[in-house]
């Protein structure tokens, strides 16, 4: 008997998830984590309705991929059940490596490590847990499988990822120009020489797709206010890393603190090492902290301070001091006794570069929980 889980999606209606491998992926904590990651990052400052998550997007992309596989098979393109399941698994996990605030953090607190790199690492980790059941899905994700059109459904110029985020982002922002005819496009898909193609009568739908994508970038993804908020967040994080490198004690959640006080790049990320000591070393510790686990990690409510800092933050606020500023009499808290009472940094700044940006971002809960 065919068992399935039915999820009611506001964009596509009922989404069927077969019990078994795909359902196990959906239930996995690493995918469920995406319920706490907004799809559009800071765009909600412009479009208050843009509160949807990357988990919702992953389910939508899965639904479109299922429709596309059925359509391609109906046109005589032979697709094994194992291949269909693998490409569905790949699209479910394609964004599993995303952190908060969309792409803002990728080149700010971690250098040279993209969300695709992290997605692949987490896929391989889940694959080990599932005794190799995701090997084919990983091959498709990495474009190492002979049937190239399967990878193009996951990542390409006309992939199911783009089709879902255009429709979903249009729905939640209210920008109707992004509402594409995804059903029509999928019906026009076919395979020629192992590559995804579109029938000639679907050319106008593709033109509308390209136009909609351009308009969504113009009106939503690159909106001047959203970009300005992203720049402020980047400035705050870069300033925080600068202060952390000088030994200044900063107010941060355990996970964010790990990234601020350790130089994480692609080499250290994959070599399971960090140059500086921390409560949790290596990629294993990095994953635990990023998931809100590990030594010193506590589950944090969005927008709430860490429990061990709550009283300290209250004390600072009672004295009119920003809890994100270095402790002490308006100066640095470092190992250098001569630094007491002096402004932080050689340039004479007292952390105002960080503080100013943080005050502007505080209404969104940004300074308190970045990885909670």
Question: Residue locations for each model-derived region?
Answer:
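Histidine-centered, transition-metal-coordinating active-site segments
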Residues: 1-86, 100-106, 110-372
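Short alpha-helical catalytic segment bearing the HExxH-like zincin motif
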Residues: 87-92
């Amino acid at each position: 008997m065919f068992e399935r889980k039915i999820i009611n999606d506001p964009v596509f209606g009922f989404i069927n998830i077969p019990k078994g491998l795909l359902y196990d992926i959906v239930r996995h904590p690493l995918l469920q984590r995406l319920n706490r990651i907004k799809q559009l990052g800071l765009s909600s400052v412009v479009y208050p309705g843009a509160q949807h998550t990357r988990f919702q997007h992953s389910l939508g992309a899965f639904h479109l991929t299922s429709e596309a596989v059925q359509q391609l098979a109906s046109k005589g393109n032979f697709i094994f059940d194992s291949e269909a399941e693998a490409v569905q698994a790949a699209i479910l996990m394609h964004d599993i490596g995303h952190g908060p605030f969309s792409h803002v953090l990728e080149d700010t607190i971690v250098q040279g490590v993209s969300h695709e790199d992290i997605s692949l690492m987490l896929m391989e980790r889940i694959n080990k847990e599932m005794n190799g059941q995701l090997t084919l899905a990983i091959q498709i994700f990495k474009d190492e499988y002979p049937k190239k059109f399967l990878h193009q459904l996951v990542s390409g110029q006309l992939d199911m990822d783009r089709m879902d985020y255009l429709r979903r982002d249009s729905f939640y922002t209210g920008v109707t120009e992004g509402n594409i005819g995804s059903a029509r496009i999928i019906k026009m898909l076919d395979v020629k020489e192992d590559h995804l193609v579109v029938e000639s009568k679907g050319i106008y739908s593709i033109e509308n797709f390209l136009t909609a994508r351009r308009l969504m970038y113009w009106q939503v993804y690159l909106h001047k206010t959203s970009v300005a908020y992203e720049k402020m967040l980047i400035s705050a994080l870069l300033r925080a890393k600068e202060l952390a490198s000088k030994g200044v004690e900063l107010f941060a959640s355990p996970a964010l603190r790990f990234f601020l006080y350790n130089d994480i790049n692609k080499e250290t990320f994959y070599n399971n090492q960090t140059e500086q000591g921390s409560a949790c070393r290596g990629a294993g510790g990095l994953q635990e902290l990023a998931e809100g686990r590990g030594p010193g990690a506590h589950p944090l409510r969005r927008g709430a301070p860490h429990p061990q800092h709550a009283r300290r933050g209250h004390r600072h606020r009672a004295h009119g001091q920003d809890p994100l500023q270095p402790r002490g009499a308006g100066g640095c808290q470092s190992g250098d006794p001569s630094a007491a009472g002096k402004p932080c940094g050689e340039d004479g700044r007292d952390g105002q570069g960080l503080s100013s940006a943080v005050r502007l971002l505080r209404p969104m809960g940004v300074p308190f929980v970045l990885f909670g």
